[in-house]
Amino acid sequence: MARGPKKHLKRLAAPKAWMLDKLGGVFAPRPSTGPHKLRESLPLLIFLRNRLKYALNGAEVTKIVMQRLVKVDGKVRTDPTYPAGYMDVITLEKTGEFFRLVYDVKGRFVIHRISAEEAKYKLCKVKKTQLGAKGVPFLVTHDGRTIRYPDPLIHANDSVQVDIASGKITDYIKFDSGNLCMITGGRNLGRVGTVVNRERHPGSFDIVHIKDSQGHVFATRLTNVFIIGKGNKPYISLPKGKGVKLSIAEERDKRLAAKTH
């Protein structure tokens, strides 16, 4: 009989995107509850130990975070299993490094270094807008923020640029055809392209057709589309490969070309 929340996560049940080896133990760090879903997050422990190699084991990560050296979205986080997720800015002030968590085309969180200037803001997808107590309008974002008194032109599925220090909206991007977007779920996870059109299916899932910079067209659900730029101009820097998914043959040719040079 299950009593209360689960406290463990087996290695084999952990998200593939964490890229943990099967034989490295029985368990994986179970992310704490937080602004991102368990399967769409990356615990700080894996980020510092497995990705950045700043620690050899979990105990060392705990020592690092307990020195209050790690900030996520401008707030010090001392929980080694804090779930950092898509678009979060991780700051290590001691080394002067800034990272933004974004997906690569294989659907994994990529360690994407950014400048101090870019680390001052993040993009958030608007989940819903509504009226709160006393008729105060507010919107809810994909990372659990509630922002009051937004611009009345902002609606669900748009993206807002949030200043991390103040939590205020500095700019917004409408969900429109021709705008740049990144896919945050499904088999096209991590791909970047421009919105071609949106098929409305009342009572079901709206389908969005997207075209990448190579001219490939693919479709996904509206819930997986995250607007990241106006026209072809992204508001954030993109990781290596610019979100273009190569076919298996193209990947092979690229590898062979790299070997011959």
Swiss-Prot record:
Return the InterPro entries for the record. KOW (IPR005824), Rib_uL2_dom2 (IPR014722), Ribosomal_eS4 (IPR000876), Ribosomal_eS4_C (IPR032277), Ribosomal_eS4_central_region (IPR013845), Ribosomal_eS4_central_sf (IPR038237), Ribosomal_eS4_KOW (IPR041982), Ribosomal_eS4_N (IPR013843)
- Signal peptide range: none
Q: Which Gene3D superfamilies match?
A: 2.30.30.30, 2.40.50.740, RNA-binding S4 domain
- Keywords recorded for this protein, A-Z: Ribonucleoprotein, Ribosomal protein, RNA-binding, rRNA-binding
What domain of life does the native source organism fall in? Answer: Eukaryota
Q: Which lineage? A: Eukaryota, Metazoa, Ecdysozoa, Arthropoda, Hexapoda
Matching HAMAP family: Ribosomal_eS4
**What is the primary gene name for this protein?**
RpS4
Please give the PROSITE patterns that the UniProt record associates with this protein: RIBOSOMAL_S4E, S4
Name of this chain's protein: Small ribosomal subunit protein eS4
Q: Which residues form the S4 RNA-binding domain?
A: 42-104
What family classification does the UniProt entry report for this protein? Belongs to the eukaryotic ribosomal protein eS4 family.
UniProt GO cellular component terms? cytosolic ribosome; cytosolic small ribosomal subunit
One GO BP annotation is: translation
Extract the GO molecular function terms from the UniProt entry.
Answer: RNA binding; rRNA binding; structural constituent of ribosome
